[in-house]
């Protein structure tokens, strides 16, 4: 149908559907390049291999963008098109961004030292943010130039060679978007994903320039300045999107649900560990993840024996997930009927206040007249009740059920999203 043809000609549609069967040839070609130029290319968890990926992607980006810059600047001068020349300068900035990415990967691959005991992995995020900043600045420069062209339009001299250059540029940027997205997913690189976003915006931008040139060729309509504005807006939006993606790991974001589930499953694989909570994950760059959690063990277990089980759990996590972890041992009374009854009652009360709420670190302190139930309540972020309201409701309901009990509550937040 006409809609189907139009969709397939759309570069955004083409790139976003890179996982379709017809895109397999491109992936196979990229894998062949990786196999040819990157030693041990399949060992993507190895920091040295990740550095090789970054260097390779940077070199490819520099070469491709310099070729596009030279071709477009010639076409822009010949046609007197501000949008083509703006697109050329955009490619030159992309070449500079590739250099920044390359340097970032080299620095991020440096081993840990006295001043940086957690390594240099976050430099990769910083380089990605620099790339994003360069994209945004270039976008505003293009916007200024394009507005001037709208106010003071000049005639265009369209040639077949300029059209060919623009079409080939779109095709090359399509491939570069796929290339960087594929590599970024393989090694989980924010910098490469930012570069892929930039290439995608370049596809859209050059497509708009091409449409403007074609309109000039087949009619008297000159939308060169307007096309330049559209290009600039696409570039600016792409820059802000890439900046957001690279800032999130720097500011601190929760681990994925898959990561949390896998880690908890590995720890709970030992039947002597009966629960886990207070998981905190720190990301110091790809391949540099540090975690800590509290593991619950029966209080009547021998302390040295429990310590051995905790040590073995730490080694399992470090071996399988390449994650440095420190586990705190929490003793839990499991063989006292009174405490078990009070724990079940407390859980039921907390769930009646909010199904999303949960408890941990439950213990009791019995006095001559009052028994204190001491526990933490895990509350989601942006919960509809305030911390004080949650405490008051739980304390009131517990006292109503067990008049001799008082709830001593600590509100806790999840660090895993």
Question: Which role fits each region the language model picked out?
Answer:
Residues 1-5:
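Short, small-residue-biased leader/transition segments that mark boundaries at the very start
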Residues 12-268:
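Alpha-helical transmembrane cores and adjacent cytosolic helix/loop segments
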Residues 14, 19-54, 245-417:
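Peripheral (non-transmembrane) domains and long loops of multi-pass membrane proteins
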């Amino acid at each position: 149908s006409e809609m189907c043809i139009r969709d397939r000609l759309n570069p955004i549609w083409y790139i976003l559907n890179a996982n379709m069967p017809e895109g397999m040839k491109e992936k196979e070609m990229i894998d062949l390049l990786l196999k040819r130029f990157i030693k041990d290319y399949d060992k993507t968890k190895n920091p040295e291999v990740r550095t090789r990926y970054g260097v390779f992607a940077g070199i490819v980006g520099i070469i491709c963008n310099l070729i596009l810059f030279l071709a477009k600047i010639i076409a822009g001068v010949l046609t007197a098109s501000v949008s083509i020349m703006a697109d050329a300068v955009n490619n030159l900035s992309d070449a500079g961004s590739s250099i920044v990415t390359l340097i970032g990967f080299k620095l991020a691959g440096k081993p840990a030292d006295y001043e940086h005991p957690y390594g240099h992995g976050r430099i990769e995020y910083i380089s990605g943010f620099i790339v994003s900043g360069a994209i945004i600045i270039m976008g505003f420069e293009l916007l200024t130039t394009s507005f001037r062209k709208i106010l003071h339009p000049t005639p265009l001299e369209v040639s077949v060679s300029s059209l060919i250059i623009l079409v080939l540029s779109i095709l090359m940027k399509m491939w570069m978007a796929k290339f960087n997205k594929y590599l970024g997913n393989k090694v989980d690189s924010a910098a490469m994903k930012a570069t892929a976003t930039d290439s995608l915006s370049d596809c859209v931008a050059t497509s708009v320039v091409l449409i403007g040139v074609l309109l000039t060729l087949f009619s008297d309509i000159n939308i060169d300045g307007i096309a330049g504005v559209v290009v600039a807006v696409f570039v600016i939006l792409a820059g802000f999107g890439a900046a957001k993606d690279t800032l999130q790991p720097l500011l601190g974001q929760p681990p994925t649900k898959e990561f949390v589930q896998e880690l908890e499953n590995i720890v709970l694989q030992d039947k002597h560990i009966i629960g886990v909570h207070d998981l905190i994950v720190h990301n110091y760059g790809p391949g540099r993840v540090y975690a800590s959690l509290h593991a619950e063990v029966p209080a009547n277990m021998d302390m040295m024996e429990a310590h051995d089980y905790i040590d073995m759990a730490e080694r399992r996590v470090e071996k399988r997930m390449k994650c440095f972890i420190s586990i705190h041992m929490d003793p839990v009374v499991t063989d006292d009927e009174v405490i078990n009854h009070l724990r079940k009652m407390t859980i039921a009360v907390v769930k009646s206040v909010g199904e999303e709420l949960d408890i941990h670190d439950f213990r009791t302190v019995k006095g001559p007249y009052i028994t204190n139930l001491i526990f933490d309540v895990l509350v989601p972020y942006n919960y509809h009740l305030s911390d004080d309201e949650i405490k008051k409701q739980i304390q009131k309901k517990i006292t109503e059920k067990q008049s001799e009990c008082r709830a001593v509550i600590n509100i806790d937040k999840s660090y895993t999203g």
